[in-house]
Structure formats: C-alpha cells, structure tokens
C-alpha cells in the first residue's frame, strides 16, 4: 500500500479498541503494521458481541498482518525482538 507512511514499519501489541484504532490509522496511511497476538485466542476484541471476526474487529485491524507469539516462552520473546528490530523507532 502506498501513502505518506509508506516504508514505515510498526509492531502493534495492543488489544480492544484504542490501540488497534491507532494501528489502523497508521496502516491506512501506508505503514506496514504487524499485529502481535497471543496463542490463547488472540485479541479479545475478536469475540466482541459473541462472534469471531466480527465487523468491528475486521474494521479496526484492516491493512495489517497478524503474528501469533507466545510471549511467555523464550522463543516467542526472541521472535518479538527479531520482529521489533525491523520496526521503526
């Protein structure tokens, strides 16, 4: 996607509404956003109003890639550090 933030890389470790909204705006402006989710069901917002992948979740997480990492494990932490190294500060 092209935009004013094209070439910017963002690693998003947020849930529910406000964090994903910020990531959505960055992605809409062209940033490459990777949403990090836990392996125990991911972002609780996925299940908002009882569904899976409801309209709100899809809207707030559009234009993003998702990566599932278990941040309780050493391997998950290493993967996060590796992913973060490629992100902009």
Set out the residue ranges of the language-model regions.
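A short, hydrophobic C-terminal helix/tail in secreted or cell-surface proteins
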Residues: 85-89
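N-terminal helix-loop segment corresponding to the beta1-alpha1 unit
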Residues: 1-84
């Amino acid at each position: 996607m092209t935009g004013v933030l094209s070439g910017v890389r963002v690693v998003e470790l947020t849930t529910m509404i406000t964090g994903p909204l910020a990531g959505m705006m960055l992605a809409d402006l062209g940033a490459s956003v990777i949403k990090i989710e836990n392996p125990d069901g991911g972002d609780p917002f996925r299940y908002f109003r009882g569904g899976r992948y409801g309209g709100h979740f899809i809207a707030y997480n559009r234009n993003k890639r998702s990566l599932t990492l278990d941040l309780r494990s050493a391997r998950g932490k290493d993967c996060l550090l590796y992913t973060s190294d490629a992100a902009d500060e």
